[in-house]
């Protein structure tokens, strides 16, 4: 009997470390899941500096000014469209780069840049901190980070931007917004104005979102059969 008891207790002995390892593993996995949930919550609630809700985009061009005006009027007239505008790209896709120089032509740094229609920042919920939108090719708006990189202090308006051979006047300052994903550091940014509608068309839909997106793609295919107009979120 005593031999059997010692044998049984011996068999139980090796289970205790195993049980500890199992509990430690479960605790580690739970902790990891908690961290992931916190990161997910952070991403969902992080201020992007613009409002992407119910915004869909399609990359397409409409040719001459008459066709552009027709397309813009068409999209604005759809009952399930809240607002529409266009730009070179969407913030999450990032933007092209341009080299910034000083007065002597010495390269300073690379800045992101984008051409936008005048109503685009308002449509996207971007904030113009001071000044106004550019109105011609000799004017630009910059973000806060651009001013910081240039060491301009708080006086940003009426400064001169030397942009890859172009000499432009700063007429507006836009609040920093997220360019690319959350792993990308905040980049300097130049905003230029365009009157052309197309390239990256942005549409903010009304609810119900999924149903209205299907409607939008259907009527777009019918209205522009010679083009690929595929809106996506």
Where are these regions (language model features)?
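Membrane-proximal extracellular/periplasmic loop immediately following the first transmembrane helix
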Residues: 41-108, 113-114
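Well-ordered beta-strand positions enriched in small/hydrophobic/aromatic, beta-favoring residues
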Residues: 56-58, 100, 140, 161, ...
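Alpha-helical transmembrane segments of integral membrane proteins
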Residues: 1-61
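"Rare, low-scoring activations can occur
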Residues: 66, 70-83, 144-148, 164-233
